[in-house]
Amino acid sequence: MSPLLQRMAQHPQLDISTVYCRLRGAKAGIDPEFGAKIQWDIPLLDGYPWVEIPNKGTDSEGFWGLYNPGLWRFVRQGNFDAVFCHTGYIRASFWITYLASKFSRSAFLFGTDATTLTPLDRRMWKRPVKRLFWPFLYRLASQVIAPSSGTWDLLRSLGIPEERISLIPYVVDNDWWKAQSAQVDRNAVRDSWGVDPDTAVVLFCAKLQPWKRPLDLVQAFAQAGVANSLLLLAGDGPLKEELQAETMRLGISNRVRFLGFVNQTQLPALYTAADVMVLPSQYDAFGVVVNEAILCGCAVVASNSVGAGRDLIAPIDPSFIYPCGDVGALSTLLRGILSDRPYLSKFRVAAGERMKTWSPREHIAATLEAVERGVSRIRPLS
């Protein structure tokens, strides 16, 4: 998010103030999903104005986990045309911000990245509750934000009018990823993995969590049986030992490397030196690793539960999307694409072209349009 905020801070039509309810992720700390202490190796707080409002809450994942009463004064005294809220509605701070915006006659923009009503924790009773509550919730917004086509369709299915929804694409800093990739010595990186330039390298880059379904990929890779191939698993998490045991059971441990947590500045080398990245998640609202990999010239295969598949992969080749959990389908897909290197090269080129219109430029333009719509709705021209 920080590269976008930096660009917005420099945009002549925007005057932004960024508020953090807490700095988790921006500073070193334990990431429970990685199961380790994480310190990102790029600056996340430079190049744009920001302030942290003290959190008086419990810092848990519940409603009172984020309770920042100072938001009321900040919004009320800020004289903002619009307030763009990224804090979820299950937090107290969301409602403080909403009420402060309403009393200030500031447009209030918020949205979701969900593409389905099915919750990540699979507690299915939440589906009918969301179906009843969300139409009311999103009508509170001056403009509703959708970062993908899948989210757009979900909001429309809930009865949110088309003119109340703005598609603001989920993007990364395209220029940075392409520039970093251009500096990578692909053969040298492969040498560090102990493989030659002709080895077919498959990459998994995500937390080793059950909903990311890395076991599907390990099993599909084994079934594919592609000669001279290597599977890289970049990431950490609670499934690591189970995955290592599975590679032993399948007899492929000599063709699988566990890289652990890989920091931001090291990722371009991974993507650039791999042939294809696979994201087998059972739920990924979008999955910006898809953006990153494509920008580094890596082909991408994803399950049909990955939001980025529809916007970034399907326009190039819908056959690179397979049914989530279907190990046989993924195995067949891997066997086919890894044996057709010329087509993989064509896919990379076409995907790179697609990213030219899915970039920070489009994101900021869509943000401006959404703000203008929201402001005009609460302050109509006389």
Named regions from a protein language model:
Residues 315-327, 336-341:
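Conserved acidic donor-binding segment of nucleotide-sugar-dependent glycosyltransferases
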Residues 150, 171:
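Carbohydrate-associated surface elements
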Residues 191, 255, 336, 343-357:
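A short, well-ordered alpha-helix in the C-terminal region of glycosyltransferases
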Residues 299-303:
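Short hydrophobic beta-strand element within catalytic cores of glycosyltransferases
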Residues 92, 107-109, 116-140:
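Nucleotide-sugar donor phosphate/pyrophosphate-binding loop at the beta->alpha transition
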Residues 261-262, 269-274:
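Short alpha-helical donor nucleotide-sugar binding micro-motif in glycosyltransferases
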Residues 196-212, 218-221:
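Conserved donor-binding/catalytic core segment of Leloir-type glycosyltransferases
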Residues 282:
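Aromatic "clamp/platform" in nucleotide-sugar-dependent glycosyltransferases that forms part
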